[in-house]
Amino acid sequence: MVSLSLRGARRTAKDAASLPFLSWTLSLLALNPLLVSAKSAADYYVRSLPGAPEGPLLKMHAGHIEVDPENHGNLFFWHFQNRHIANRQRTVIWLNGGPGCSSMDGALMEVGPYRLKDNSTLEYNEGSWDEFGNLLFVDQPVGTGFSYVNGNQYLHEMDEMAAHFITFLENWFDIFPEYERDDIYIAGESFAGQHIPYIAKAIQERNEKAQMKPKWSLRGLLIGNGWISPKDQYPSYLTFAYEEGLITKDSRTAKNLEVLQSVCESRLEAGKNKIHLDDCEKVLSEMLTKTMDVSKNECINSYDIRLRDEAPACGMNWPPELTHMNYYLRQPELISALNINPEKKSGWMECSNAVSSTFRTQKSVPSVQLLPGLIESGIPILLFSGDKDLICNHVGTEELINNMKWNGGTGFETSPGVWAPRHDWTFEGEPAGIYQYARNLTYVLFYNASHMVPYDLPRQSRDMLDRFMQVDIASIGGSPADSRIDGEKLPQTSVGGHPNSTAAEEQEKKKMKEAEWKAYAKSGEAVLVVVIIGVIVWGFFIWRSRRHHRGYRSVYNKNMSGSSVLERFHSKRSGADMEAGDFDEAELDDLHSPGLDREHYAVGDDSDDEQQHQRQGSRPEGGQS
């Protein structure tokens, strides 16, 4: 009996027997939506990018990874594949600060391969950090930038943030397993100076528990103008202001600020385990107010003291590209290109007040307390500072280092009472800053740089990154820069050009040409081998056919066409000068030569062997059909 299914196809009794299994499978999928909704790397592939420069699009992936299913918490990422591989695969994770400020700042204004030229046009960043490392930008905590979460379920503490980030990495590596064994570096700036050490510690704890899973190879941390040690950073405001001439000592303004400073220091003594202290925030706020130009309604840019901004922003409107960012990242075409989930209802914002006001870290200790343990565990750490930043100035970072104890010493001492020297760094003939190193900690001070060092000095910042990652390569993607420490030329790193720069294009064309010639040479060799084999086979068949022809010609007779087999035999015998009377059965066997038989059937046998060989040759490797 034949019945019809709902889809109108013919279904037999055998098919009907499989229905329970089908129903069970559908029920399983219904109960496990992850089996249906699981995404692959293809779902995150960025196929186009509005305003991208002419030429091939860089290989990118972007989208959301769920980290909090209960509250639909999703972190947004934007990943760029490296342009060149040096001696090993590396992945650099970049985080901006806030808390609650988007890492799209880093992607489009600092270390990413593109910079915004205007509201809708991108241009290449000549100092992008993706030359020797895959770049992964993440908007975190949930609610930051393109990331989102239901309602007001924002995070409060550092351990929550770190747990979300570990979940993000686990899920991200499930989708992109080819990067899980990369050397991992975590970099960022500002309040990321709190995030990064906590994430690093969480990775170490995860690795200790990992049994069947690969351990993540955390190779280093880079923190720029970081908010790491409040007890060292808060008092540095006034010290830095005096050094830079923003405040005149013994002036009325100075005395007012010193009163606030003393209150702050007393709070710090009692609250040394606090990341944020309102009484200390008042010092900077009052400083910006007292140094205002009332006639112009301008105040010091707290991120770059060389600049002024309208009050009360005092730097919040900087850099000027922020105007372009706000427009570009809200375009429907861009939202579609970066695979933004429809659940993300609100438009992109650089910094979220909701995230910042909730993330108060009342139970979290400052990350400076984690640094010694991380360094002693073998993780190299690099702290770098732009010398024109006020809000996270270099004076506070240097004080942090001077007071910190790690690996059997205090600060940069190499032995009791002896400190590691400061080395002068020049880049392409110009003073670039200083380098200082001791016991697995490196400090770099950039001259003429703001809170966002890579924004001001992209090529110098990548030179720093490449040296920290121990990249040593003469010329890939551009001309190597002349970078020197105390006048001594350092190992070459390519920091001069983007893959679409003229030098890089010429280099790529040269490589392609060489590859083409190698391909032609290999093709020529293959063709020659085929021709030789063909000639040999052709010659063999010619020889075989002639031999057969001679054998058959000896029994050929013009008058044999209508004769019987016996008559043909007699004719052959007479043609061979044999007498008819000598005919017997044995002679017939002799004339019916086994050798001739084998030769006759050998042609067919060869053909069969050849067909079998052809079938074997056409089989895909691994036995796949």
From Swiss-Prot:
Keyword check for Protease: yes
Name of the gene: kex1
Alphabetized UniProt keyword annotations: Apoptosis, Carboxypeptidase, Glycoprotein, Golgi apparatus, Hydrolase, Membrane, Protease, Signal, Transmembrane, Transmembrane helix
Family that this chain belongs to: Belongs to the peptidase S10 family.
Bilayer topology term: Single-pass type I membrane protein
SUPFAM superfamilies: alpha/beta-Hydrolases (SSF53474)
Record field: transmembrane: 523-543
Name this protein carries in UniProt: Pheromone-processing carboxypeptidase kex1
Ranges of biased composition (kind: Polar residues): 491-502
Organism this protein belongs to: Aspergillus terreus (strain NIH 2624 / FGSC A1156)
Domain of life of the source: Eukaryota
